[in-house]
Amino acid sequence: MGFLTAVTQGLVRGADRMSKWTSKRGPRTFTKSRGAKKTGIYTSDRKFVQIKEMVPEFVVPDLTGFKLKPYVNYRAPAGIDTPLTAKALFQETVAPAIEKDFKEGTFDANNLEKYGFEPTQEGKLFQLYPKNFPR
């Protein structure tokens, strides 16, 4: 095999397939068959003994009555996630509990620790005020 052929194959197939597979490549548990793990051990007389705990077990949920198909079209538009803001986090977590207590008449403005409010930041690793970074 010529030099140009080897370079061309390396560019087309990818360089990782062109280099020689030696014991120096990959971890000790990685076998030559591209990621397959061993499912047993070899005994002293070179016989392979399969160990049940080493055989991978695939857990598949029951999908009877499931309406969605397992295929997603590659032309489907990408999903849009709005960034999480402090206001949105407050509206999702604390606001329902405050509204419920306000309607029941049990809301106490002096007892905000009930909703997760911390009046001081002493003893915290990362403090919001003063800033953790030097100016």
UniProtKB/Swiss-Prot annotation:
Which residues pair up as cystines? none
Transit peptide (first-last residue) = 1-13
Q: Which UniProt keywords apply?
A: Apoptosis, Cell cycle, Mitochondrion, Ribonucleoprotein, Ribosomal protein, Transit peptide
GO biological process terms held by the UniProt record: apoptotic process; mitochondrial translation; translation
Q: What does this protein do?
A: Component of the mitochondrial ribosome large subunit. Also involved in apoptosis and cell cycle. Enhances p53/TP53 stability, thereby contributing to p53/TP53-induced apoptosis in response to growth-inhibitory condition. Enhances p53/TP53 translocation to the mitochondria. Has the ability to arrest the cell cycle at the G1 phase, possibly by stabilizing the CDKN1A and CDKN1B (p27Kip1) proteins.
Q: Family per UniProt?
A: Belongs to the mitochondrion-specific ribosomal protein mL41 family.
Q: What is the name of this protein?
A: Large ribosomal subunit protein mL41
Task: List the source organism.
Answer: Mus musculus
